[in-house]
């Protein structure tokens, strides 16, 4: 964690100087989060209909610095990601004990170029993920952890590289890979690959229907993630998504990383 923070500073601080080509930016995020990918910053909630659990996402990704090139269609940015995804248990009287929480932070670099037949973009992230059980996973009356699962160390530092192509503004396909350069437990695979796509269609000027899917080869079980719904607002800007979701494969939560998780449900995200 300390190494990741220091590397972040070493990359950012030299750019704050008035070097030619670099400047701070307050423009919208250049590489939009992958809709079906779990490991993206979001603000929202998903209800698991089959087991009455909830997933709460809190986080954001911001571009901080941009590089100006002579090519009018090419853009390069550097930014940061900070978010958590939390597993909650649904109980009566609107009680939602926190079972497990995973947090991710790091930084990213993205590049986009407008070609004659579409937009080619790429994003490289260097991130840290850590996972923890919380008091909702503990049985206070017996003094034991629930389901016989005690807390265990789960931590990883990794590179995540995505290449995407959008032939039109409402269609995007992508491929990517993870390289885990430090991981605990060490039995986890160091390489993972994924591929996916997104499609949206305007219904009115402020309402868009969409669908998205991602397949991830994790080295444990393949993970399938599907999402379909509508968005109120600008498709590439601020708005609110309401959607149906399907998940099949290993759990996204580090404390449950070797346990199969299959659910369907409904959710919403607020795109900032």
Enumerate the predicted regions with their spans.
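Outer-membrane pore/translocation modules
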Residues: 19, 72-197, 248, 257-260
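Short loop/turn motifs that connect adjacent beta-strands in outer-membrane beta-barrel proteins
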Residues: 31-35, 65-78, 114-120, 166-171, ...
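Outer-membrane beta-barrel initiation region
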Residues: 17-77
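Cleavable N-terminal export/targeting peptides
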Residues: 1-22
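Solvent-exposed loop/turn segments connecting transmembrane beta-strands
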Residues: 48-55, 117, 181-191, 203, ...
């Amino acid at each position: 964690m300390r190494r990741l923070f220091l590397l972040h500073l070493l990359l950012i601080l030299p750019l704050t100087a008035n070097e030619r080509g670099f400047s701070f930016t307050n423009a919208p995020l250049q590489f939009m989060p992958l809709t079906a990918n779990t490991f993206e910053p979001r603000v929202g909630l998903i209800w698991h209909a089959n087991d009455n659990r909830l997933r709460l996402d809190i986080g954001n990704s911001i571009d901080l610095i941009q590089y100006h090139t002579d090519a009018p269609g090419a853009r390069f940015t550097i930014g940061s990601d900070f978010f958590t995804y939390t597993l909650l248990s649904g109980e009566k009287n609107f009680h939602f004990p926190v079972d497990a929480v995973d947090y991710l932070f790091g930084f990213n670099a993205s590049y986009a170029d407008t070609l004659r037949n579409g937009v080619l973009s790429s994003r490289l992230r260097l991130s840290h993920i850590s996972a923890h059980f919380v008091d909702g996973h503990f049985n206070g009356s017996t003094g034991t952890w629930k389901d016989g699962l005690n807390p265990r160390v789960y931590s990883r530092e990794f590179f995540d590289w995505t290449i995407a192509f959008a032939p039109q503004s409402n269609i995007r396909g992508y491929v990517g890979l993870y390289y885990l350069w430090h991981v605990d437990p060490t039995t986890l695979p160091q390489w993972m690959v994924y591929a996916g796509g997104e499609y949206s269609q305007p219904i009115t000027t402020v309402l868009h229907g969409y669908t998205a899917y991602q397949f991830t080869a994790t080295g444990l079980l393949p993970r399938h993630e599907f999402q379909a719904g509508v968005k109120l607002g600008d498709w590439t800007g601020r708005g609110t998504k309401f959607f149906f979701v399907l998940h099949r494969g290993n759990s996204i939560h580090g404390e449950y990383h070797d346990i199969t998780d299959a659910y369907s449900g409904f959710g919403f995200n607020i795109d900032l």
